[in-house]
Amino acid sequence: MGGISIWQLLIIAVIVVLLFGTKKLRGIGSDLGGAIKGFKKAMNEEESEKKDADFEPKSLEQQSKQAATESKKDKEQA
């Protein structure tokens, strides 16, 4: 009995529609939806970047050894 009834919510909704109009409310709704969509997209991109960064890169020594062996193979084939 201290809560808001459905009738009170309905009266508040009617007052809001009368004050702002349906066009403005529709615009606010689409802006809010776009903001939520952009937020979700940014969160997904951040998670994918974390997944990409989880691997451990090869050390410089391993990369230089690999490059040296590849260049030797290229010279032998030529």
From Swiss-Prot:
Residues 47-78 are annotated as: Disordered. It is found in: Cell inner membrane. One of its GO terms (molecular function) is protein transmembrane transporter activity. Residues 60-69 have a biased composition (Polar residues). The chain crosses the membrane at residues 1-21. GO terms for cellular component: TAT protein transport complex. The keyword Transmembrane helix applies. Keywords: Cell inner membrane, Cell membrane, Membrane, Protein transport, Translocation, Transmembrane, Transmembrane helix, Transport. One of its GO terms (biological process) is protein transport by the Tat complex. Residues 47-59 have a biased composition (Basic and acidic residues). It comes from the Bacteria. InterPro entries: TatA/B/E, TatA/E. Gene3D superfamilies: 1.20.5.3310. Part of the twin-arginine translocation (Tat) system that transports large folded proteins containing a characteristic twin-arginine motif in their signal peptide across membranes. TatA could form the protein-conducting channel of the Tat system. PANTHER family: SEC-INDEPENDENT PROTEIN TRANSLOCASE PROTEIN TATA. The Tat system comprises two distinct complexes: a TatABC complex, containing multiple copies of TatA, TatB and TatC subunits, and a separate TatA complex, containing only TatA subunits. Substrates initially bind to the TatABC complex, which probably triggers association of the separate TatA complex to form the active translocon. This is Sec-independent protein translocase protein TatA. It comes from Vibrio vulnificus (strain CMCP6). The gene is tatA.
